[in-house]
């Protein structure tokens, strides 16, 4: 389960990064259905269109989306985006429900090796997870206007199944003053999971990461903290293939006992983006944000208020048979910590947090991808909120906490990925920390340096 700035033990844990490949899995699920029922493919015009597309129609290399992949997602994982090209079979005039004809089930398997530059106290280095994740997906078109992407994941880290990223959509098209308006409704469980770009947190690079390596303590709320902890319903529109807008309202799941950091009432999320082609160059520029009041403990009394405001951009350019993309994300978070400071868990009543991510990806012949990125999280110094961890005599020293009460962390990531087939990915990623929880050296007063958390992560990722 994800946690966010719950300071009962004086530590903070960044949520494990979920992996994702929504349209590839819809594609592979449909392809499996086609192979199993090839003789009836022509009787299923909408699914025949889905299964007739190569995975490269939706993805540069999975899980990155092409322009068609973005349109397919905004059209609710249905074939509305290509309906004009579909010739309906005369025998297929029943009401538009296709879930009884095919069962769009897919499987994702990941196994990984993680090695840090310095072993974590009390553990062996070079940990292997088999599996790291095992996911089942129900992903595809239910009716001509309704589609689903539902992921249930088994985590090797905690040995349990949970409902992972889920997005159920209704979508349709209309015309306003001769301009196309795509509109829809989304029901999902993770702010930004509904977004079609890779410059927002849910689908940003890295697409998979180590869940057994140390990560910085501080994370913005919109940056995956509420993932799978909330349910939201919202509406979106895409006007003239340029302007995208989305408003979704989230509410915490009713769990007994309640989770720490439960949302009081509802938490509104908003998104606005503009996309434009300049010759062969593509550019998206946007903004998104989230406001939430959270109970840090019991569901009563004062709350903490979080305001997240973010800006993002995505750039793409084909280079012959190759492809280049780049992403930039900036998130500002304002924190009014009335409840936390009142309970003595924060030195300040008001803190801020700034997050920046910049990455570039080069795809060679859809078989090899090179990734490089820079990341930074800087914020207010708060000796109680980010302070040094408690050290228990006779126990290994923790790797969390900050000796100077600073959340500042920054560094670089590099990755190489090889795709021998469209549904198989082998990759190796290396993370370098130049600063971790406020310092480069002895960051939590236990003698551990930021460089000790540098991480090699080797992954095998299979989809079927």
Language model: regions and residue ranges:
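Transmembrane beta-barrel architecture of outer-membrane proteins
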Residues: 129-133, 163-167, 228-230, 265-269, ...
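Extracellular loop and loop/strand-boundary signature of outer-membrane beta-barrel proteins
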Residues: 121-123, 153-155, 218-221, 255-258, ...
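Detector for outer-membrane/organellar transmembrane beta-barrel domains
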Residues: 280-414, 418, 430
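The canonical Cys-X-X-Cys-His
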Residues: 52-63
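Outer membrane beta-barrel
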Residues: 66-67, 100-116, 121-255, 264-280, ...
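Short sequence motifs at beta-strands and strand-loop junctions characteristic
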Residues: 99, 126-130, 160-162, 222-227, ...
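Outer-membrane beta-barrel "beta-signal"
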Residues: 54, 424, 450-464
């Amino acid at each position: 389960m994800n946690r966010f700035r719950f300071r009962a033990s004086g530590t903070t844990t960044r949520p494990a990064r979920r992996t994702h490949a929504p349209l590839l899995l819809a594609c592979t699920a449909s392809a499996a259905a086609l192979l199993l029922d090839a003789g009836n493919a022509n009787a299923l015009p909408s699914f025949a269109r889905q299964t007739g597309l190569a995975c490269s129609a939706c993805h540069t290399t999975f899980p990155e989306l092409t322009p068609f992949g973005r349109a397919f997602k905004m059209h609710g994982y249905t074939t509305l985006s290509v309906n004009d090209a579909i010739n309906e079979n005369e025998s297929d005039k029943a009401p538009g429900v296709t879930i009884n004809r095919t069962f769009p089930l897919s499987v994702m398997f990941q196994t990984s090796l993680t090695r840090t530059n310095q072993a974590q106290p009390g553990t062996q280095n070079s940990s292997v997870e088999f599996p790291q994740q095992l996911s089942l997906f129900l992903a595809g078109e239910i009716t001509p206007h309704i589609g689903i992407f539902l992921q249930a994941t088994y985590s090797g880290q905690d040995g349990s199944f949970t409902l992972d990223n889920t997005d159920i959509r209704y979508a349709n098209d209309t015309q306003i003053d001769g301009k196309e308006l795509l509109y829809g409704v989304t029901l999902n469980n993770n702010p930004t999971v509904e977004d079609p770009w890779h410059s927002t947190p849910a689908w940003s690079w890295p697409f998979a990461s180590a869940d057994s390596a140390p990560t910085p303590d501080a994370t913005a709320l919109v940056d995956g903290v509420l993932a799978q902890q909330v349910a939201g319903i919202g509406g979106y529109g895409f006007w003239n293939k340029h302007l995208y807008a989305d408003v979704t309202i989230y509410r915490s799941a009713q769990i007994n006992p309640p989770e720490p950091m439960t949302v009081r009432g509802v938490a509104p999320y908003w998104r606005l983006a503009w996309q434009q082609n300049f010759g062969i160059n593509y550019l998206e520029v946007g903004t998104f944000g989230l406001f939430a009041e959270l109970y840090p403990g019991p569901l009563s009394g004062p709350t903490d208020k979080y305001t997240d405001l973010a800006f993002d951009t995505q750039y793409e350019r084909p280079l012959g048979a190759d492809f280049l993309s780049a992403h930039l994300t900036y998130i500002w978070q304002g924190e009014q910590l009335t409840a936390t400071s009142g309970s003595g868990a924060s030195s300040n009543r008001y803190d801020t947090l700034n997050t920046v991510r910049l990455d570039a990806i080069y795809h060679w012949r859809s078989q090899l991808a090179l990734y490089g990125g820079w990341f930074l999280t800087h914020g207010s110094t708060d000796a109680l909120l980010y302070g040094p961890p408690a050290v228990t005599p006779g126990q290994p020293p923790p790797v969390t906490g900050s000796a100077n009460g600073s959340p500042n962390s920054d560094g670089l990531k590099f990755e190489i990925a090889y795709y021998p087939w469209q549904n198989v990915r082998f990759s190796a990623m290396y993370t370098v920390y130049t600063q971790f929880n406020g310092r480069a050296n002895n960051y939590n007063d236990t003698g551990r340096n930021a460089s000790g958390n540098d991480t090699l992560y080797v992954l095998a990722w299979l989809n079927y």
